[in-house]
């Protein structure tokens, strides 16, 4: 996982995402375990099954939830980005191991943001 996170840090676009104060406060207030639950919920509802009509549009880019910002920063925001960066086919239904991997990447990034 460190290898992909380091690669993402070198991307001008991916490295431009950061949690603002409001998002950091939200993580602190809710707690990391609740944020992880949200991440699982978003990934299962928005990314598990590939939808050609929604892919690339399902994750807001505004600072509305820390998981959304993390998804853009970690290229887990849509199935096209997941395929390009994480080499998981965009047309297959994500299995539990793939969902765990995606959520762990998201959470590692959020934890890193909270520590910086």
Per-segment meaning from a language model:
Residues 1-43:
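Core of compact, soluble alpha-helical bundle domains
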Residues 54-74:
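Immediate flanking context of iron-sulfur cluster ligation sites
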Residues 80-100:
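Iron-sulfur (Fe-S) cluster-binding segments and ferredoxin-like electron-carrier domains
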Residues 101-116:
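Short Fe-S-cluster ligation motifs
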